[in-house]
Amino acid sequence: FHSQKEIYDHLEDQTFSYSGPTSMGKSLLMRIFMKDKILNGFTGNFAILVPTKALITEISSNIVNEDLKNDLSTHNYKVVTSGNSLFLKQNDLNYIMVVTPERMLYMLMSYPNISIDYLFIDEAHKISEADGRSAFYYKVTDMLIQRNRKPKIILASPNIPNPQVYLEALPYNQNASVSYLRTSFTPVSQMKYYLDILNHKFYAFNERATSPDESFFEISGISQHATCFSLIQAIINKDTTKSNIIYCSGRERAVDLARQYAASLPYLNDKKLNALAKEVEDEIHGSYYLADLIKKGVAYHVGYLPLHIRTTIEENYREKNIKTIFCTSTLIEGVNLPADNLFILSYRNGQPNMSPVEFRNLIGRVGRIEYNLYGNVFIIRYSESQSEKKIKELLEKDIPEQKISITSGLNETEKNYIVNQLKNGSTEFTQLSNQNSESYDLMRKVGLILVRDITKDRNSVVRKSFNDYLDNDGISLIKHNFLNTNDDKPKPDDDINVSLDQTQNLIIAIKGGLTYPALKNGKVDYNDLLSFLNKLSRIFRWDMYEKDTVGSNRLRYYAVLLTQWMDGYGLSQIMQQAIDWNKNNYGSVKIHGQLVPYNNSQDHQNIVIGDALGIIENVILFSISNYFLLFSTEYKELVTAGSAFDNDWYEYVEFGSTNPLTIFFQRNGITRDTSDYIRRHHEYYIQTKNGYRLKSDVLSCGKESVEKELKEIQYNVPELFV
């Protein structure tokens, strides 16, 4: 297609920003470009920044399994998805990094000599979001252009009318030669329908209408007895070969609606689906609703599902074994699940309303250039709480021009507050009145970027955005406050997750003798762990900075799950322990926002399982993992002269094990579950002077998920096999 060729020809530009419909295959163009460069002898490093871990898995797997395969080793490339990878310690390799901006920041801090030649920022519209995550884009790009090799930067965004705005997020010296392109061409066709059950009308939407009165035309009435599910079922039954996605506003809603929808459906007795259902029962819990739904060709797709379960569901959906998926905003965030029919039951993304960008990104799931060229979108209004006006606006109105978050996300009061705190010598930013948690997170991280840029004399994007709030005297005062300090007071650094008051508390604690507790018989002791977490809570002031996660009143429960996670328990064991804990400790579950005493019913068990999976994903593997990383990094700096040390609990959290063998295989890119499977099957590995190696027999071990994963690993790490 002409528009794709036009974009492809710009990927060698020094700086290029482009936007187009979700369906045009923007990330596919990046992958084709990288493959072409590598096969033609280019030696250098690529990085793709993506907003979610789900996209890391999808894109890295496509690069390894579809694009390069054995060409990776032939051309001396490794695909890297984490800063813990052993490959980053080798100086003779080329890298394709697929990471989130947060992971990229820690990789750049840990490996100051690594440069990136091509930086692709996928889903670049995230730079517009007024939250703390957008701050990482400013930080990472600024750090990269300070490196020996300045990268070429390519930004890709969906449906944005002004893609050139994201060039404003890049440092000034990166923008000497820039280009941008917007295309509205899509190679796929969509039909959009609005089903108003309350008014009993079925409309088609006309995108070519010249006036609002012509946008919607009624094609039929809707029965007085129709329900949301009866309409969905009637449409699906017209062609049962079609794939269907049903969008819901939240995880609880997606699970509830999936169960209601599947209640009247028969079991399919499909061998592949039954095997997947058995895997869900074995690896999560026998009472978990998802397993029963899968047997009927139905599933739900929510963020807390274990990665390999989620990807296997996606594969079965693409192969049309699973025909209908109920999903949440994980789908908006770029996971490539193509649909013939998309049913939208809410215009909310969690609690807030969907933005026009999110809505266009969502409906872009219908009709995908790699899968199908035609699809239908059905927006269903079935409740008075749904605004007819809002639904029609989302369909009719174009996406407004976007701004970067540093421009639109911070107001004058917030910027003045940041400057005044820095003038007072403090990076302790407290949440302002009427400030939501997302804006507070952005303000705090921007403040930490600003003080670092001022003390380093960097004329960064963030620094320039404060030009109207800082004069020369103010800059001199801030430099004096943060550079003329004694050795005990930390200087500003590149880590925007932690402020100097937190770092100073940590330094004092480590100098005072704080260490990770010793293991007892090779295991983590719950009481020792809880005591250590309480110390970290005071050091890092979680009550102030982490109110919604580790600063909440659930730390004892988090410690229960974390102990089992670090000791290498399987998910099914952890889920059963979580159920038992709630049963034995008079726990409670939240249903529709209300706390209800736990009664050990299957409903309550499923709520506990969902909650526990969410804690592992969002609290243990994100919040707690980050704080343990901070502790370990500072401990190395102060105690071990930068060297690795025994009993590093950050590793135990990150890898979910204290076992060196399991950790070794995960450092080579193998997942926790597969690494643990290998540990339990001695016949599949040997120990050499260079570490553990896998026997080729493991590729036919009989466990499908293990075989599939290790075949991918064999392309990326062939030296791991004997």
Model-assigned labels for residue ranges:
Residues 1-722:
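N-terminal helicase ATP-binding lobe
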